[in-house]
Amino acid sequence: MAPSFDFAASILLCAEDNTAILDLGEESEEISWVVGVDASLGDLSMDFPLQSDDCIEALLGREEQQHIPMEGYLQRLLLQPDGLDLVAVRSDAIDWIWKVHELYKFGPLTAVLSVNYLDRFLSVFDLPQEEACMTQLLAVASLSLAAKMEETVVPHPLDLQVCDAKYVFETRTIKRMELAVLNALKWRMQAVTACSFIDYYLHKFNDDDTPSTSALSRSVDLILSTCKVAEFLVFRPSEIAASVALVALEEHETSMFERVATCYKNLKKERVLRCYEMIQDKIIMRNIMRQSAGSVFSIPKSPIGVLDAAACISQQSEDTFVGSPATNYESSASSKRRRICR
């Protein structure tokens, strides 16, 4: 069982200098793995830097040691302690992140990092169940930190709290939560994610040719979608990236992958193929839903629709990937009625 939240809560109560909270200036800004991003999820157009073989091998060694949730995190989510559906709680938090991400047209890596921070924190600390607002506070802090890492223009913390947010937190409270996250993650914020590997595998599985824009767009869609489905937490970022590349390229032959996999002992072919099959299973599930539902409701044919449909089945809820910007702006009009949390 993870440690209690007492340590993080004590940080929330202490006073700190606002300039110490990840105040990144031009001289200290880290280079993003994703460059040239058109942040609209509906029309992704981006270039990922192609990593060298040596760089990929180094990333494979780093990802498990520093940048993924603690072992046993998924099992703890599925146990539902005291009847609390932690998978649904996590999904709700990610739903909200997706809505704000779309509203502000953040880049895809901002969304991926937000979920990475949220999961890594939850794998270390148990949030108090009696404080429903704590999960939302964590979601706000995770998104704020990710935006500071990746975006050139970062909204004020108060401006992030839109899109049907149930609580509104003061800026100082958000900054204290950010500090709690930073300490829990040991300030390792430039996380190794599936985005770190995707361009490399797209090239390798495409005979070292530059992948098409549609293949890259599908890959990003799938990476974003796998973030929400809790079952994919059992896989490492490199395994998800390799599987996503195979699906995006509609690659059914594994001979090329076998040649690549033999180069890196840290990349296990069996796990990649298992992840690949899980994604394909979600596609089959989507098709069954479309056939059985008929005209009652339709599920998008995109990868996002595929995995969101799977999440919908597993949670018995109609989850969506992103919220409508129009709805998001309308929801801000009622913000005065929401509780302000100090």
From Swiss-Prot:
UniProt keyword terms in alphabetical order: Cell cycle, Cell division, Cyclin
Molecular functions per Gene Ontology: cyclin-dependent protein serine/threonine kinase regulator activity
UniProt keyword annotation of Cell cycle present: yes
Pfam families attached to this UniProt entry: Cyclin_C, Cyclin_N
Name by which UniProt lists this protein: Cyclin-D3-1
Biased composition (Polar residues): 322-334
Family in the record: Belongs to the cyclin family. Cyclin D subfamily.
GO BP terms in the entry: cell division; G1/S transition of mitotic cell cycle
Species this protein is from: Oryza sativa subsp. japonica
